[in-house]
A protein has these predicted regions:
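A conserved helix-loop-strand patch within extracytoplasmic ligand-binding domains
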Residues: 113-165
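Short, polar/charged alpha-helical segment
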Residues: 51-70, 180
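Bacterial signal peptide processing site
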Residues: 23-26
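Short, well-ordered beta-strand elements
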Residues: 38-52, 70-75, 162-166, 275
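Ligand-binding pocket segment of bilobal, Venus flytrap-like solute-binding proteins
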Residues: 85, 91-95, 164-242
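C-terminal motif of bacterial Sec signal peptides marking the signal peptidase cleavage site
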Residues: 17-21
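An extracytoplasmic/periplasmic, membrane-proximal ligand-sensing/linker region
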Residues: 52, 172-188, 192-209, 270, ...
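A bilobed periplasmic-binding-protein/Venus flytrap-type ligand-binding module shared by bacterial periplasmic
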Residues: 126-136, 254-267, 290-291
Length: 319
């Protein structure tokens, strides 16, 4: 299933990631010159521009450097360009993919330049959400059939007289315009511009206890700060989203995957084995994401704090 985008470093780049959404510019040219280098104890990881993906890389980088003795370079790359970079050996691993069947067919099955690195252990899901305080006041708003009833309350200056459905970046893969059209809803999709901008807007609405309807996804640390309730869309069935123009169903629940450059997977030694074994829970990821995004720790500091408290989890990845 195509999810977050059609395309979820160092501490300095980590800070940049918090300010950008899933539509950050293609940075493949920043790829490490050591990526896929024979015999080099250097690993280059792709970082997507949302905090959950940053949490994965932060912990993997910390353990690779402090427990296995590797140097780790990280590169910010949009999701689809990341597949190209991975195939070319510009990066060695991608730790959180939300589903790109076209790229999987091309690079994994046909060209065999990329291999599946196993499940991350986290299940991703996109949906429409309203704040829980609004859902408690109006329980029927959680059924899409009743959304038009509340369109006037969800109208904003940007939505042109219709209710507002807030999305993130225009570069995200989203079915929302088709859903609004095919479900004949009196709503306008309005893009915040990035994940960070969307979070800022959600927090502002919540501070003022205003109603809002937003495209959002799990896992995401913000749920702990702003409780939200999902709106039930028509049930997802396999293939219901095959034609982007005709989508009229909910988004699926997708086990997130890791992918490795094929040569790296074969010759990457302990680093490749470690990345294949890296597997944690939604709770683990959210714990690190909160440390980075809410408590403002650097990615390395957040990773160290998690590593110090979860040895029984990560020790198995080093075998």
């Amino acid at each position: 299933m195509r999810l977050r985008t059609r395309m979820s470093t160092t501490a300095a780049v980590g800070a940049l990631l918090l300010l950008t959404g899933c539509g950050a510019a293609d940075m493949t040219k920043q790829a490490s010159p050591f990526a896929n280098a024979q015999g080099a104890r250097t690993v280059t990881l792709s970082v997507q521009s949302w905090v959950g993906a940053q949490a994965n890389v932060a912990v993997a980088q910390y353990l690779l450097e402090h427990k296995l003795g590797y140097r780790v370079d990280t590169v910010q790359v949009d999701e689809v360009p990341a597949w190209d970079a991975l195939s070319q050996g510009r990066v060695d691993a991608l730790l959180e993919d939300w589903g790109h069947p076209e790229q999987e067919q091309r690079y994994v099955r046909d060209k065999k330049t990329i291999v599946n690195g196993g499940e991350l252990g986290v299940t991703g899901h996109i949906g429409w959400y309203v704040p829980t305080y609004f859902a408690k006041q109006h329980p029927d708003v959680t059924d899409w059939k009743n959304l038009d009833k509340y369109a006037s309350q969800l109208r904003t200056a940007e939505s042109g007289g219709k209710g507002q459905l807030m999305d993130g970046s225009p570069s995200y893969v989203t079915n929302d315009k088709a859903l609004v059209n095919n479900l004949d809803l009196n709503y306008q999709v309005v893009f915040a511009g990035s994940e960070a901008a969307q979070i800022t807007q959600i927090k502002q609405f919540a501070k003022e206890e205003k109603p809002f309807l937003t495209y959002w996804y799990a896992p995401q640390w913000l749920f702990k700060k702003v409780p939200m309730t999902e709106v039930k869309l028509p049930a997802y069935k396999e293939g219901c989203d095959a034609d982007p123009a005709k989508v009229a169903c909910a988004y699926p629940h997708t086990p997130l995957q890791k992918y490795l450059n094929a040569d790296f997977a074969e010759s990457g030694g302990k680093a490749a084995r470690f990345l294949k074994d890296f597997n944690w829970t939604t709770e683990d990821q959210n714990e690190v994401s909160l440390l980075i995004a809410d408590q403002k720790l650097s990615p390395e500091e957040a990773a160290k704090k998690w590593v110090d408290g979860h040895e029984s989890t990560w020790r198995a990845w080093l075998s």
